[in-house]
Amino acid sequence: MSRYRGPRLKKIRRLGALPGLTRKTPKSGSNLKKKFHSGKKEQYRIRLQEKQKLRFHYGLTERQLLRYVHIAGKAKRSTGQVLLQLLEMRLDNILFRLGMASTIPGARQLVNHRHILVNGRIVNIPSFRCKPRDIITTKDNQRSKGLVQTLMASSDPGKLPKHLTIDTLEYKGLVNKILDRKWVGLKINELLVVEY
């Protein structure tokens, strides 16, 4: 399967809030269609929805998600927690968390267009895995700084996770440590994704 490029609000109505996919929210009364199926959900459907939440939030293909599950399965710790840590330490997600991009697809575009430096080197791979003590900055040119400047001014510093720090004057972010589970901004049961 390729990356999803269709209407985002349809996915949000079906799966719930996905802050990495879009800032938009559905209208409160828009999902009042009468559903005639029973209230009981099958286990397969629940697991599939959790997997789709993860895929659409982080902007992954099916193959990428399977690769991350495989890597997390080899770890000695909890597979679900390691999976979330791997996904949260991706460069595109860290840019989104720092407030340098409004959504994860927007962060992917910044990385693909070579506006982002990691430890002084240009990185154009959105799935680049950041490590603790990595310094993430923009290029020195005015265009790159202008793209990030407006977004950083409008972002709320109180929402910044504890594993990241940001210097808004120099447009610089620092990865302090690997993320804790409680700072993941998505309501998801990661064990159901691993079971799927």
Swiss-Prot record:
Which SUPFAM superfamilies does this UniProt record tie to the protein?
Answer: Alpha-L RNA-binding motif (SSF55174)
Q: Which UniProt keywords apply?
A: Chloroplast, Plastid, Ribonucleoprotein, Ribosomal protein, RNA-binding, rRNA-binding
> Would you kindly state one Gene Ontology biological process term found in this protein's UniProt entry?
ribosomal small subunit biogenesis
List, alphabetically, the SMART domains matched: Ribosomal_S4 (SM01390), S4 (SM00363)
Q: Domain (S4 RNA-binding): give its ranges.
A: 89-169
Keyword Ribonucleoprotein applies: yes
In which compartments does the protein localize? Plastid, Chloroplast
- Its family? Belongs to the universal ribosomal protein uS4 family.
Q: What is this protein called?
A: Small ribosomal subunit protein uS4c
Q: Which gene encodes it?
A: rps4
